């Protein structure tokens, strides 16, 4: 098969990262978690007491992705591995706000485009098919019900030892959907040539197989 790029987009907790990792593994491609980049910048924003000078924040930031056999993708922020801090509730609650800022978006998108230049990439996020990889060979827009997405996030938090309330998670996800879809810069939307894939009620294996079937149709 020729080298291709795959873009997976969709709202929070639609299963993008889980599926992207699985698809990349099955196809021996490289997985890039763009959300982790925005989470890392949000983590720094919080450490800087919620600075509003986002241009200065990114100008004084180094951000790299590395890969370890035991951990997968690791996020190196200013020479520190911050991977284990990126899923805490404080980061989750602020990431949409930080990601909506133009300097942050431009900084992250530039890095994402550089990573995808050689092809062989599976990338997931909110604007991959529309902004980062508009020429991706396959674009999938993943959706799921709010209830199922909240349940996934709740179980994920349990596994990570993070306390959370199911109803609060539902409200947070609904609010984040509205914020992501209505922001001025790179809003969440389906690319015109993307395939919609509803993951509600489906297993990881079922969704992975559906995407692999799509890949097999690429000439």
Curated annotation (Swiss-Prot):
GO terms for cellular component: cytosol. CDD domains: CMPK. GO terms for biological process: nucleobase-containing small molecule interconversion; pyrimidine nucleotide metabolic process. It catalyses: CMP + ATP = CDP + ADP; dCMP + ATP = dCDP + ADP. Its EC number is 2.7.4.25. Gene3D superfamilies: P-loop containing nucleotide triphosphate hydrolases. It comes from the Bacteria. It is found in: Cytoplasm. Transmembrane segments: none annotated. ATP binds at residues 10-18. Pfam families: Cytidylate_kin (PF02224). Keywords: ATP-binding, Cytoplasm, Kinase, Nucleotide-binding, Transferase. One of its GO terms (molecular function) is dCMP kinase activity. Belongs to the cytidylate kinase family. Type 1 subfamily. HAMAP family: Cytidyl_kinase_type1. This is Cytidylate kinase. It comes from Staphylococcus aureus (strain bovine RF122 / ET3-1). The gene is cmk.
